[in-house]
Amino acid sequence: MTRTVLITGATSGIGEAAAHAFAGAGWRVIATGRRAERLDALVAALGADSVHPLVFDICDEAARDAALAELPAEFADIDLLINNAGLALGTKPADQANVDQWKTMIATNVTALVSMTHRLLPGLIARKGAIINISSVAATYPYTGGNVYGGTKAFVEQFSLGLRSDLHGKGVRVTSIEPGMIETEFTLVRTAGDQAASDTLYSGADPMTGGDLAETLLWIAQLPPHLNINRLEIMPVSQSFAGFQVARNG
């Protein structure tokens, strides 16, 4: 029986790679995002029988609900939700940060994620489906300038554990996956398009790729139904935990 996955933020990075991985494994993929041309390219590459695009802003609940209401029958029964859409904005410490960027991160990484989850929960419970939430190592290991971004990802981690508790006995699997350095458009978005900053961050670091995470997501999704990965932290070998910072006199 063919299963269906809905992937938010499927126009680039982890989400785009996941769409390729799941379609390649025989899943039907509902790919969501704001950039219609990117979603059209996915359909062209993977086929309309495998991928159905939904164009909307993840923070626009009315647009989301309208798009979901128009799903073709063969894509309507969703077995897996991958909450991937998210972003970091700004690199400044809290006293210099832009509060509007903070609000956008909370709206995208927290509010939109919980709203999408709530919207799909009845069907996921009925089908004993699964939810995979993309958190970050920033939820556990703070760094300068990661203030609100790290806080939103810590929320995702705790929300995932709370869902596991709430859904106990209903057969729904919930996973929080917490990736470290991965080369996507993440830094370009965070720095408002600073290509040099992005190149510097990843240069020589041998970071993870979207494909690495996509294969991990597929592995989790295809585990036997009696197994649940609660949390999974994954980094490139080149990355480790940040050391404690010390401010010295003089």
Regions found by a protein language model. Give the residues of each.
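The beta1-alpha1 cofactor-binding region of Rossmann-like NAD(H)/NADP(H)-dependent oxidoreductases
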Residues: V55-A66, V99
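Conserved glycine-rich Rossmann-like NAD(P)H-binding loop of the short-chain dehydrogenase/reductase
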Residues: A25-L42
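Conserved glycine-rich cofactor-binding loop
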Residues: T11-S12
